[in-house]
Amino acid sequence: KFNKKSVIGLNIGANKQSLDMKGDFSKVLTFCGDNINFATINISSPNTKHLRDFHNKGQLKELISEVITNNNELQAPIPIFIKISPDLKLTQLEEIVDITDQYQLAGIVATNTSTDYGLLKDTKAFSKGGISGSPLLHKSTKILAQVSIISDGKIPLIGVGGVSSGADAFMKICAGASAIQLYSALAFVGPSLIASILKELNTILDINGFNNISEAVGSKKVEYASS
């Protein structure tokens, strides 16, 4: 049952068997849009063939244009985010930031999982799927920082990828994130992890002389973008 007091977001992707990926994004938004507070257009899962093709400028513009049209037809249009891959070149990030600004999206979620198996100690153990958790932390944070620089801090960013502690969350914030998402660590540790992260994060903010999270957002983006 939908609780109006809760903030509910929907991560919209495409199925492997989809015959119309672009159309499916809009169909799901139309069907669910009136019961959620925000939606994320996930074009970055490495497990769905051709899904990452939507990072290409032309295809992305077509997708976002259709999604925005359907969003505007809802009873109350909702904020739309876009979730990107960590395996992108700088020119691709620049195009994504331009499109995000052009269509006035709510923000960018950086990042999804990676297909860079060099991040693993044992590269022979995996040959498909996406890398998540701690091996992804630094790669995803670098992309986050680069997006923050390209957008000049004017586009809200959600940092995700390898966060399992207050120190990890602080890294994402300093790279440019104004919000954090968890998945892998939450699955391993459980809901108690959130309180632990918040407690550690408060201590780290105090030690570094920040009065609040907003003051720390993007404070080390140049450093992390080149690391």
Model-derived features with residue positions:
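Glycine/Thr-rich beta-alpha phosphate-binding loop at enzyme active sites
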Residues: P46-H55, L93, I99-G153
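C-terminal helical cap(s) of enzyme catalytic domains, especially alpha/beta-barrels
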Residues: Y117-G133, L186-F210
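Active-site entrance/lid segments in N-terminal catalytic domains of soluble metabolic enzymes
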Residues: K1-Q104, Y117-L120
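Hydrophobic faces of well-ordered beta-strands that scaffold small-molecule active sites
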Residues: I8-I12, A39-N42, I80-I84, I108-A110, ...
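Extended, intrinsically disordered, low-complexity segments
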Residues: L137, K199-S227
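Glycine-rich phosphate-binding active-site loops on the catalytic face of alpha/beta enzymes
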Residues: I43-S45, G107-T115, A169-S196
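Conserved hydrophobic residues forming the short capping helix/wall of the S-adenosyl-L-methionine
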Residues: N71, S151, L201, L205
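Catalytic cores of alpha/beta
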Residues: S26, L88-Q102, S148-G153, V163-I180
